[in-house]
Every structure is written in C-alpha cells, then in structure tokens.
Amino acid sequence: MSTTTATGSQGPALSEESALTRFLRATELDTRTLGMVAALLVIWAGFDIYGGLVRPGEGLFGGSFLTARNIWVLLVQTSSIAVMATGMVLIIVMRQIDLSVGSMLSLVAVSTAYLQVYKLAPALGVGHPAIWITAVVFALALGALVGCLNGVLIAYLQIPSFIVTLGGLIAYGGLAFWVARGETVAPMDQTFALFGGNGPLAWVGPTWSWVLAALACVGILVAIITARTQRRRFKFPLRPIWAEAFLVATGGIAVLLITWVVNSYPWAPKVAEKYAIDNNIPIPEGVLDPSGDGICRAADKIVRCAEGLSFETGYTIPVLIAIAVGGLVTFLAGRTRFGRYIYATGGNPEAAELAGINTKRLTVMVFTLMGCLVAISAIISSARLNAATNNLGLFNELYVISAAVIGGTSLAGGIGTIYGAMLGALVMQSLQSGMTLLNFDTAVRDMVVGFVLVFAVFLDQLYRRRVK
C-alpha cells in the first residue's frame, strides 16, 4: 500500500519533468542560456527591491534600478564589453585566451585620442570631417596590427597564448602610459564623440527605434524560416511548427519590450532646451526660465524647463554598433567556413590539421579579428567619456572573459555562442551598475565579480560532466 502511494505521488512530478524536457527538446533552447536569462531577471529585480528599501525610487519594485533611464544607461555601458566578448568567444573556442584586451583597448584609445587632439585638429582645424574618419581608420588598423602580432607569436613561434597575452597586458599598458604621458587626452572630435552615445545626434529617436525593432522582428522570422528550409534540404529533424512560432514570438516580444523601454527615457531638460533653441523648435509657453534665454541653470528650474517639452532618446549609436557586431560575428561563426574551422579546431586540433585546416593561419586571423573588435570598443569607450587615459581598459580583460564564460563558452574549447557572451556581458555590467547605484564598496564589488566568475566556471564543469 505504501509503495503504491509513493509511486502515485511521484507520478505528477515525473510527468511535469517529462513535459519540460519535451518542451526544451522541441524548441532546442539551451538550458544554460535560460538559466542566465533567469539569473539576469533575478539580479534586476533584486537590485530594484533592495534599492526600494534603502533608497526609494521610481523603479518597478520601488527602487532606482528598473527605470527606463537606468536600463538605457546600462545598455550603453554594456556595449564596449559586449563587442569584445564576441571575439573572446572565438578565441576561447579555439582553446586560446587573450589577457591583453584591456591594455590593448587603452593603447588604441590613447593613440587615437593623441592623433585627434595633437595632430589632426591643429592641422585640419577643429571639427573637420576628415578627423573622425581618419581616427576610426587608424584605430581599426592599430587594433588589427596588435592583434595580428599576438596571433603570429602564438601560431608561428609556438608561444602559449597565456604567456603572449600576459606579456601584452603589461607591455601594451606601458606603451599606453608612454603615449599619454600619464595624462588624460581630451577632448575628442564632436562627430567622433557620437560613437559613445553623447548628444542628441547619437540618439536615433523613437520613430527610427521602432523601425529598427520592426526590421529585427522580420529578421527573426526570416532566420527561423531559413533555418527550417536548410534542415528540410539536408533532411535534418524539423522543429514542430508550434516551437518555431514560440521562438519567433518570444524573440519579437523581447525586441519590442526593449524598444519600448529605451523609447520611454526622455532627454534631460537642459539638453532638450538647447536642442530646441539650436534647431528653431517652438518651445511651449512657460517652459523657459525667467531670464528668457532658455537655459536651465538652477536646480529649482529643472522641473519647469521640462514642462511641455519632451524628446525620447531611443537606441543609441554604441548599442546599435554592439548589436551589429554581434550579428556579424554570429554570421561568421555559424554560416561561414571561417567559423566552422574555428569550432572544428577547438573541438579537436589534431583532427582539424589532418583534415587540411591551416590552424596557424586561422589563429592569426582570429586574433587579428579580436584586435579589430578591441579597436571598436576603444572607439566606443573613449567617445563615451570624450577622453582617453592609459587605464581606460583597466580590468576589462577580466570582464570580457567572465562574460564569455558566463555566457556558456567552455574554457576547454569547442563550445560557445555569441549571443550567450553578449548576455553574459549584460549580466556582468548589471552587477557592476547595480552595486555602484547602491553605493557598494569597491572591495565588495570586486569580490562579487570574482565569485561570479569562479561560480560560472564551476557550473561549466558540472555541465560538461553531465553531457559526458
């Protein structure tokens, strides 16, 4: 009797587990990705709830974290790390590592800033359109050169990547200090500063944000249909129609929700006033301050200046750059011979060489690509601050590696996704932003980040054992 009762009590649990397993199998959702999304939501809710207790705000749960403004800022802050994390995935998948990305970012940033401030601006004149174009090309070329140097030392001189990039971390950091002479190099060219999301011209606004969101939804639909067509062509198992519809709906809802959030963040009153005056936009009566010049200077005038005049920010240039880079690297990794060779080499280097893959050239190409991505991050970071220093990329290598590992990239090689790394970057930046917003001590923030990295590697080891 007791045996029958026990079996009966376990029946529903087994049925639920079986239903969940069937759902995951049908949709082919990665359990680690789902866990990371759940962790991200818990982090956001936790910071907002705790913030509501110690410092009430306008957030969803009474704090200051889950507000349109903070989410908008969070996405901008994540852009730089997310861009580098996409390249770090490919490097780790190949069973390599790059510890020099932080110092490389500093070197590229201060060199590009030095070129703008001390060479191009005096020669061409402040604001000349050739300044920002030359600076961007120079940054990409320098990043590619440094990345290529790392790749050559690793591939052809057979020096372990850990040693090469550890040396680069020190050497490139010293070179950055030498270029900047320990000073802050500023200001950047006005057009160049747009890459950091500074100013109204760097914000696409609500209309174009919704247009981009609609295009993204169409892209998700096309990607699902294309993948299904390819599966049918090569006689691979097909996902059920309901599973395909679920993936399209989930992706579309996520895109629309994020777009709604970024469109809900209005411009700062001073920025709105100045933009309206510079562009001859009518200002509603009673909005200007008593002096009549339209500039909000005193704190008690900020509310009055915001009345009747409102612009929404929408997506910013650095966020769009990060999304574009993520899409491009995802395409390279999954739809090109270059990407297939990377995963084949990471899965079994010896077999890859026997199959005719030039692993040495591939290594140089991957590290060169990493250098270009670091250069893009350097452009975003220095443009956002409108300045560059030799410690601009301090500890960035740790955050980038953490983002990749948290995103599901295996340190053993052969496994990793680009979107997972970008989600991992968002998780890491959420932790940093939340603890900073709540005035956590720097030591506490560092300890939390270190613990999260170790815990992520521990979970990766558990996952690999389970798969085996």
Label the predicted regions.
Residues G219-R233, V329-A333, S377, M422-K468:
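C-terminal transmembrane helix and the adjacent membrane-cytosol boundary/short C-terminal tail
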Residues I43-D48, L66-K119, L145, G151-F162, ...:
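Single transmembrane alpha-helix segments in multi-pass membrane proteins
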Residues G147, F367-A378, R384-V449:
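Transmembrane alpha-helical segments in multi-pass inner-membrane proteins
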Residues G173-L328, N390:
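Transmembrane helix-bundle core of multi-pass membrane transporters
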